[in-house]
């Protein structure tokens, strides 16, 4: 029996193994979150609630069918923070750390798993990268929790309560988990610009991409004035920053005469910036999202669909996919066959992957929304918003999550899971491995457009 199980595991592809590990993580999360000690007395808790919360926390989405503050005890909050940590940093990153502590050698198979889990394209330096990522994320969360916890002493009566809220907020923001224990997201801090600024920084650190953090760290400690940033870091940083800025301007323009009417300029500035940053995958909000106009909600859907960067805590099609699509469109419109940026020519295989990811994501969002329009009674925009939030593992909601039917919740859970592991991993999971063609047929042109 044991031998057969071992052969079955060996027969699985890296993508299938990663999916299996995340499934096991969800199972463990369900068990831990269902422990009586994890709940407050009298809390209403069902299996579907446990499963949904487990998938949401492992995928670091933040959509929830229960009120976190009213449902979970202090022990439950610690368990939730642990699951967010596990899902945010990545199973293989933490697995690498455990293997190294146990003195085990990281072999070729383990390196392949790490590559799939973190969307990396090469073996070289992968283990060292994971060690640096874990070190950086834990330090960011620690200092974020320390700063917020100390600051929260002005809000809460005891050190325990202040630092509990501070460290949970830091972990939730850095992992882009979207969970909160205030019971009202970041709305209680809508006029506290310091808390908003620190939270935005933590969201960015988690969503911009682990390789970018490592390169920035190396740059800061480098003795060379001209540090050779990789093409990935250049494209990711510019795209990520542009989306945050463009998103803030768009939200401001659409809400200036609506939800933002009559507010001070600094309130409007932080409202626009925070909501735009949260759409990268943060999931926290300083305003009731349902108060926003339909045009703004649709705009936010597009931002959530793009999501965070590859090899980060977030989901969506990813910022580099969006950037490559725009670059391909720009060069095609100018009559250029090759796509060039920063004195480099992009590989046709990467351009094809970005197109495949985008098309598959559109089909997934369309299909999930279509199913929800059949099973649910909410408006099309509300359902589309929920699906985009799940796919981008964002966690923003118009307040309909708890009202979804069991079928609707299952659909959202599937979308959250795919959003976390990534479209490419999902395709490799259900399809075959990449193979090189041994022969080619004659090429023929097809009329397009």
From Swiss-Prot:
Localisation: Cell membrane
Transmembrane annotation, as ranges: 17-37, 46-66, 75-95, 133-153, 194-214, 235-255, 297-317, 355-375, 380-400, 411-431
GO biological process assignments: potassium ion transmembrane transport
GO molecular function, one term: potassium ion transmembrane transporter activity
Deleted gene: phenotype: Impaired potassium uptake.
Pfam families: TrkH
Entry keywords, A to Z: Cell membrane, Ion transport, Membrane, Potassium, Potassium transport, Transmembrane, Transmembrane helix, Transport
Membrane among keywords: yes
GO-annotated cellular components: plasma membrane
Recorded topology in the membrane: Multi-pass membrane protein
Broad class of where this protein is predominantly found: membrane
InterPro entries linked: Cat_transpt
Function statement: Integral membrane subunit of the KtrCD potassium uptake transporter. The 2 major potassium transporter complexes KtrAB and KtrCD confer resistance to both suddenly imposed and prolonged osmotic stress.
Description of how the protein assembles with itself and partners: Homodimer. Part of the KtrCD complex formed by an octameric catalytic ring of KtrC and a membrane associated dimer of KtrD forming a potassium channel.
Protein family per UniProt: Belongs to the TrkH potassium transport family. Ktr (TC 2.A.38.4) subfamily.
Protein name as catalogued: Ktr system potassium uptake protein D
UniProt source species: Bacillus subtilis (strain 168)
């Amino acid at each position: 029996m044991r031998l057969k199980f071992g052969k079955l595991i060996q027969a699985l592809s890296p993508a299938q193994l990663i999916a299996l590990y995340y499934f096991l993580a969800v199972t463990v999360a369900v068990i831990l979150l269902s422990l009586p000690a994890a709940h407050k007395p009298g809390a209403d808790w069902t299996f579907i609630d446990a499963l949904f919360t487990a998938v949401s926390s492992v995928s670091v989405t933040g959509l929830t069918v229960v009120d976190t503050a009213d449902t979970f005890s202090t022990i439950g909050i610690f368990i939730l923070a642990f699951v967010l940590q596990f899902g945010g940093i990545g199973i293989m990153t933490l697995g690498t750390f455990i293997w190294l502590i146990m003195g085990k050698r990281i072999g070729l198979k383990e390196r392949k798993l790490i590559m799939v889990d973190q969307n990396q394209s090469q073996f070289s330096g992968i283990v060292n990268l994971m060690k640096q990522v874990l070190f950086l994320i834990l330090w960011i969360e620690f200092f974020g929790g320390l700063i917020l916890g100390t600051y929260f002493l002005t809000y809460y009566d005891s050190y325990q309560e202040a630092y509990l809220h501070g460290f949970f907020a830091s972990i939730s923001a850095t992992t882009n988990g979207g969970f909160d224990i205030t019971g009202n997201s970041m709305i209680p801090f809508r006029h506290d610009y310091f808390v908003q600024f620190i939270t935005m920084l933590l969201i960015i650190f988690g969503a911009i991409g682990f390789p970018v953090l490592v390169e920035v760290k190396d740059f800061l400690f480098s003795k060379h004035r001209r540090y050779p940033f990789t093409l990935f870091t250049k494209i990711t940083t510019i795209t990520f920053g542009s989306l945050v800025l463009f998103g803030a301007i768009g939200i401001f323009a659409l809400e200036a005469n609506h939800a933002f009417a009559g507010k001070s300029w600094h309130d409007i500035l932080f409202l626009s910036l925070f909501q735009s940053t949260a759409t990268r995958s943060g999931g926290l909000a300083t305003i009731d999202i349902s108060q926003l106009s339909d045009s703004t909600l649709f705009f936010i859907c597009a931002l959530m669909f793009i999501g965070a960067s590859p090899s980060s805590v977030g989901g969506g099609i990813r910022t580099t996919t969006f950037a490559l699509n725009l670059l391909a469109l720009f060069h095609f419109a100018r009559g250029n066959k090759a796509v060039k940026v920063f004195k480099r020519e992009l590989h046709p295989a990467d351009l094809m992957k970005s197109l495949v990811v985008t098309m598959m994501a559109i089909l997934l969002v369309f299909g999930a929304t279509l199913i929800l329009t059949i099973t649910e009674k909410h408006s099309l925009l509300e359902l589309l918003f929920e699906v985009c939030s799940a796919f981008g593992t964002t966690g923003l909601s118009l307040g309909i999550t708890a009202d979804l039917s069991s079928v609707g919740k299952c659909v959202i859970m599937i979308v959250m899971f795919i959003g976390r592991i990534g479209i490419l991993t999902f395709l490799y999971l259900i399809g075959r491995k990449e193979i090189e063609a041994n022969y080619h047929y004659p090429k023929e042109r097809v009329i397009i457009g």
